[in-house]
Amino acid sequence: MAESRQTRLQVKCPTCQTAVVWKPENAFRPFCSQRCKLIDLGGWADEEYTVTAQEEGLLEISEPDGAYR
């Protein structure tokens, strides 16, 4: 009964754009299926996707005073 009062959140599968109800029972969310999930994983493995980051200051590591050498 609580579910009927709440609006079901629907999202589009990132791979095939099929509408998917966002709920804990969907083990593949936000994907619609294991197949779409694996297609996306393959895209990351093939470096089809990237995550941009600020490179400024990322590699600046200072050694503490008296560090062993």
Swiss-Prot record:
Keywords: Metal-binding, Zinc. GO terms for molecular function: DNA topoisomerase type II (double strand cut, ATP-hydrolyzing) inhibitor activity; zinc ion binding. Signal peptide: none annotated. The keyword Isomerase does not apply. Zn(2+) binds at residues 13, 16, 32, 36. It holds the Pfam family YacG. InterPro entries: DNA_gyrase_inhibitor_YacG (IPR005584), Znf_NHR/GATA (IPR013088). Binds 1 zinc ion. GO terms for biological process: regulation of DNA-templated transcription. Its cofactor is Zn(2+). Inhibits all the catalytic activities of DNA gyrase by preventing its interaction with DNA. Acts by binding directly to the C-terminal domain of GyrB, which probably disrupts DNA binding by the gyrase. HAMAP family: DNA_gyrase_inhibitor_YacG (MF_00649). Belongs to the DNA gyrase inhibitor YacG family. Interacts with GyrB. This is DNA gyrase inhibitor YacG. It comes from Neisseria meningitidis serogroup C (strain 053442). The gene is yacG.
